[in-house]
Amino acid sequence: MIIPVRCFTCGKVIGNKWDQYLDLLQLDYTEGDALDALQLVRYCCRRMLMTHVDLIEKLLNYNTLEKSDNS
């Protein structure tokens, strides 16, 4: 969904690093090098960025208020 604001394990703020992480990946950094550049050294924080799946854009396509006509 949306990147969590804090790491689930240690509580470090990581939500502000998501866009920078994606930018570094676009510049052909490896995942490890991008996380090193963002100064994320704890494996729990690294996990939060590496395993996040951004689904918010896909979910915005669905309108929960629409009723389907199943007659």
UniProtKB/Swiss-Prot annotation:
| Highest taxon of source | Eukaryota
Q: What is its main location?
A: nucleus
PROSITE patterns given in the database record: RNA_POL_N_8KD (PS01112)
GO CC annotations, alphabetized? RNA polymerase II, core complex; RNA polymerase IV complex; RNA polymerase V complex
Which GO molecular function, any one, fits this protein according to its record? DNA binding
Looking up Pfam families in the UniProt record yields:
RNA_pol_N
Positions with a binding annotation for Zn(2+): C7, C10, C44, C45
Write down the InterPro entries for this protein, in alphabetical order: RNA_pol_su_RPB10, RNA_pol_suN_Zn-BS, RPABC5/Rpb10
Q: Where is the signal peptide?
A: none
**Recorded coiled-coil stretches:** none
Q: Where in the cell is it found?
A: Nucleus
Q: Cite a single GO BP annotation.
A: DNA-templated transcription
Which key words are in the record? DNA-directed RNA polymerase, Metal-binding, Nucleus, Transcription, Zinc
Carries keyword Metal-binding? yes
Record bears the keyword Zinc:
yes
Role played: DNA-dependent RNA polymerase catalyzes the transcription of DNA into RNA using the four ribonucleoside triphosphates as substrates. Component of RNA polymerase II which synthesizes mRNA precursors and many functional non-coding RNAs. Pol II is the central component of the basal RNA polymerase II transcription machinery. It is composed of mobile elements that move relative to each other.
Q: Which family does it belong to?
A: Belongs to the archaeal Rpo10/eukaryotic RPB10 RNA polymerase subunit family.
Quaternary structure (record): Component of the RNA polymerase II, IV and V complexes. Interacts with NRPD1.
Name-wise, this protein is DNA-directed RNA polymerases II, IV and V subunit 10
Source species: Arabidopsis thaliana (Mouse-ear cress)
